[in-house]
């Protein structure tokens, strides 16, 4: 078996997993990194035929691009935008294949039924933990199961800790997915454990964990930051009784999922929380970032980040900055960069003052560990070269096979992001003092005097680097890899002015960097991919480089699993040594161990819940007994007589209620709730309004954040004007979004300015009605009440309004000067300006129109009155006109007495112009 075949061969647990996925319709929950791209590729490949029509939901752009490239099949399509029209998609669906599609497009196609839904082979749902009862994905599966009882549904999730949030989330996800069984694949699964734990030779499983000690200053900083975290958590639990849970503690406050845990407890009470509690939540986020930076960044970058969070502007936003612990953190951070020289005995005896601190930055302990690992690797490479040479001389028959084996050991260092990759590369090539000096020299936050010799060295280095040279660094992979810079560090940490440290676009697009000053290949690779544009990049790097030594610079659970699987897959061909760097008794170690503990706890609870779960027989909706498929127009308070009464809920086609919905609204859960109430939805591209309930009622839906933005920019006034022009009963719906409460923060100025602007809006548009809704469930009930006994809206009329409002106007048809002038007139907007341009041949003709003529042209009496008043009102008030007339008479009387006037007077309409008469002397 060659190396390529070894890299593509599936392990034993992967083979069993592939068969289970193909034959079973279940919810599969995996530990991080257990579900590999190789298994998914083989699953997708099984459905890339003309006889299959399979939709894949929840895939990121990077995953879609990866699988399209790897499958290399004409039956694999990506529909993520409106580039394919409805008729084109209909033809594509008819030809079959595998479709990576967005939920918004698929839900519209299912509602319009542009293809036979019963012909769909199945739906594959990725990231199933994100599905909610009224989400787009749940809406799609409900529409799918209503018309298709035979097709499969398969759901995957690699985030088991998400099932710990909320009450019985596993059962709710299975119910929304119409799945009766769940398959759990933790790391301690017997098959997974057997496949990854290599038996026999210890060299195949050689992993070296290097535990580093924190320096004295780092330990001081960590202790004080942890004190601030503990105090903030206890104070937060005191202020918010809903957080009195054992899960809310200082340990979980350090994890990345703490915000989700807080959201699960506080979403319902966010509006009742005072500003002090919100400030504490923001402070906890800052503490978590600083504790992460402490072990990840060098001393200069950490101090620069700390300066950003402790600046004078931040004192008014966070009270922790003036605490004693914060002062100790700042002093210790500065002490890592500047060292105070010790006094000599003579200076101590004479009582001399303290000497000026000198620039002696603390070297990152992990940098020193990497240097030792590389030196050890180089020695092994030299030893390996000698052994190969000896074996070649002793046995000529085996020389051909030995020649295939490279004597150099390739080293791959995994870091978290591109910034760490660049700084570590500079350290390995230039040394720590030069890198630190470069960061300080180019920082706006740090005011430290560098030694003159170091400044001269940096300046000469900058001049040398400005010349074209490929001496040290080269791009090792030309393939585009859009690695976005993650939450890596401060914006002003010294990386913004020097090209060797700056994260440039070229560095962002690199897969990895090769440091060429060493005798053996050394590559540095960032594994964090926040933009999700390069999925499965770690596995691709491992397979393409096939490193002999792997160094995990920043510990990450998913990265460790991916390396573990790669080692097991390459074990027959290659012995891989792995170095794991971590600080002993540090927050970094605690976060890593906590992630393992939480994942194990999640699977233990999932196993218990699975064992005690009661699943109804109709869960998979193979018949009409599943109540989740019923479309019930009645209220929750109405009594249900019997299970057979659901037949009476289905109305006849003639009595069906219809609501016209703008396609952009399908991002919310309101369309799903309306459909569940027995109301048919007609997706359209509406230019006026978001929901058309009746021929007379048009609704514009706004969340609180959208409302503030629309009021500030004036967009809401134009929308209200358009609704009032075409509908008798325009409605502004202000809906409170539950999910956006924790992340949305409004300033006091925004909230205080909303009411006056709403008052102005209602005064200008008296027919506009406002509805305040606490949530989508209440909104759906209000819509149903508003539609009772009313006529159904016509899609043709709504589209006619859209065409009339937008129209097709050629910009070169109109003179740009009067067009621009007219656009600035009161009452004129981008829609009705063309009505004036088409009616009037000139501005003179416009000025001669009566107010009634303007009303007929604009089809709006209010707009016509505003425009007419702007054209014909006097420019001066009555008092100003009287003063001007009196002044004109006095000037004329004065001129009659003067033989040689000093001023030339020009009388304009309602205005006097005085010009010095200098030319009269000539």
What is each model feature region?
Residues 72-106:
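Inter-Walker segment of RecA-like/P-loop motor cores
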Residues 2-68, 110-112, 135-141, 146-152, ...:
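Helicase motor interdomain insertion/brace
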Residues 133-134, 426-615, 619:
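Conserved RecA-like P-loop NTPase helicase motor core
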């Amino acid at each position: 078996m060659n190396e390529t075949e070894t890299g593509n061969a599936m392990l034993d647990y992967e083979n069993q997993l592939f068969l289970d996925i193909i034959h079973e319709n279940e919810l599969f929950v995996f530990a991080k990194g257990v579900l590999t791209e190789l298994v998914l590729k083989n699953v997708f490949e099984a459905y890339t035929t003309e006889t299959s029509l399979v939709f894949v939901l929840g895939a990121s752009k990077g995953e879609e691009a990866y699988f399209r490239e790897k499958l290399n099949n004409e039956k694999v399509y990506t529909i993520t935008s409106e580039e394919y029209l409805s008729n084109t998609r209909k033809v594509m669906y008819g030809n079959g294949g595998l479709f990576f599609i967005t939920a918004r497009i698929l839900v519209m196609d299912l509602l319009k039924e542009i293809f036979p839904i019963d012909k769909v082979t199945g739906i594959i749902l990725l990231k199933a933990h994100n599905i909610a009862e009224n989400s787009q994905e749940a809406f799609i599966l409900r529409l799918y199961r209503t018309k298709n009882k035979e097709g499969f549904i398969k759901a995957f999730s690699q985030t088991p800790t998400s099932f710990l949030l909320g009450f019985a989330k596993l059962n709710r996800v299975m119910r929304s997915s119409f799945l009766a069984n769940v398959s759990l694949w933790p790391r301690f699964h017997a098959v997974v454990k057997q496949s990854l734990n290599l038996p026999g030779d210890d060299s195949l499983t050689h992993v070296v964990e290097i535990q580093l000690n924190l320096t004295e200053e780092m330990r001081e900083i960590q202790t004080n930051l942890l004190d601030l975290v503990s105090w903030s958590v206890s104070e937060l639990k005191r202020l918010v009784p809903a957080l009195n849970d054992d899960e809310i503690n200082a340990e979980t406050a350090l994890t990345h999922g703490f915000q989700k845990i807080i959201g699960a407890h506080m979403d319902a009470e966010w509006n009742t929380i005072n500003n002090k509690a919100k400030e504490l939540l923001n402070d906890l986020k800052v503490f978590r970032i600083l504790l992460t930076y402490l072990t990840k960044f060098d001393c200069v970058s950490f101090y620069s980040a700390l300066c950003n969070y402790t600046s004078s502007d931040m004192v008014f936003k966070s009270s922790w900055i003036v605490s004693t612990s914060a002062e100790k953190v700042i002093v210790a951070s500065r002490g890592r960069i500047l060292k105070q020289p010790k006094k000599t005995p003579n200076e101590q005896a004479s009582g001399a003052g303290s000497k000026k601190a000198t620039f002696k930055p603390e070297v990152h302990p992990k940098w020193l560990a990497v240097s030792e690992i590389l030196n050890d690797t180089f020695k092994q490479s030299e030893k390996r070269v000698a052994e190969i040479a000896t074996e070649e001389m002793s046995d000529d028959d085996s020389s051909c096979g030995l020649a295939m084996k490279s004597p150099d050991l390739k080293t791959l260092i995994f870091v978290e992001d591109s910034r760490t990759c660049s700084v570590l590369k500079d350290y390995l090539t230039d040394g720590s003092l030069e890198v630190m000096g470069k960061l300080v020299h180019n920082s706006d936050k740090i005011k430290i005097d560098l030694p003159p010799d170091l400044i001269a060295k940096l300046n000469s280095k900058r001049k040398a680097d400005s010349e074209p040279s490929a001496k040290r660094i080269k791009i090792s992979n030309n393939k585009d890899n859009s690695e976005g810079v993650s939450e890596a560090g401060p914006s002003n940490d010294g990386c913004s002015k020097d090209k060797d440290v700056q994260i440039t676009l070229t560095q962002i697009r690199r897969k990895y960097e090769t440091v060429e000053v060493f005798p053996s290949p050394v590559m540095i690779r960032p594994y964090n991919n926040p933009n999700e544009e390069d999925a499965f990049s770690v596995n691709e790097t491992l397979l393409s480089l096939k490193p002999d030594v792997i160094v995990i610079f920043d510990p990450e659970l998913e990265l460790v699993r991916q390396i573990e699987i790669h080692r097991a897959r390459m074990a027959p061909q290659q012995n891989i040594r792995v170095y794991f760097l971590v600080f002993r008794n540090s927050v970094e170690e605690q976060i890593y161990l906590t992630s393992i503990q939480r994942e194990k706890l999640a699977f233990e609870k999932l196993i218990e819940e699975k064992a005690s779960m009661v699943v109804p027989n109709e869960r998979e909706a193979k018949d009409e007994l599943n109540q989740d498929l019923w479309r019930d127009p009645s209220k929750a308070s109405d009594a249900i007589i019997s299970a057979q009464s659901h037949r009476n809920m289905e109305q006849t086609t003639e009595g069906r209620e219809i609501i016209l919905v703008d396609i952009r609204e399908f991002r919310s859960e309101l369309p799903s709730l309306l459909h569940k109430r027995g109301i048919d939805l007609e997706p359209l591209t509406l230019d006026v309004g978001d929901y058309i309930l009746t021929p007379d009622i048009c609704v514009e839906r706004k969340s609180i954040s959208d409302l503030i933005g629309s009021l500030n920019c004036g967009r809401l006034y134009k929308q209200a004007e358009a609704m009032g022009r075409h509908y008798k009963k325009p409605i502004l719906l202000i809906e409170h979004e539950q999910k956006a409460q924790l992340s949305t923060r409004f300033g006091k100025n925004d909230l205080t300015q909303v009411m006056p602007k709403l008052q102005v809006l209602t005064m200008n548009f008296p027919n506009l009605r406002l509805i305040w809704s606490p949530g989508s469930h209440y909104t759906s009930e209000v819509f149903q009440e508003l539609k009772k006994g009313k006529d159904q809206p016509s899609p043709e009329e709504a589209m006619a309004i859209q065409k009339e409002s937008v129209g097709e106007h050629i910009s070169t048809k109109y003179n740009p000067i009067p067009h621009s002038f007219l656009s600035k007139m009161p009452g004129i907007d981008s829609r009705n300006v063309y009505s004036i341009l088409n009616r009037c041949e000139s501005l003179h003709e416009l000025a001669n129109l009566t107010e009634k003529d303007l009303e007929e042209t604009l089809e709006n009496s209010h707009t016509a009155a505003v425009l007419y008043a702007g054209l014909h009102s006097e420019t001066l008030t009555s008092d100003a006109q009287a003063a001007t007339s009196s002044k004109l008479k006095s000037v004329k009387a004065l001129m009659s007495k003067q033989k040689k006037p000093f001023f030339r007077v020009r009388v304009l309409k309602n205005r006097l112009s005085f010009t010095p008469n200098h030319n009269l002397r000539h």
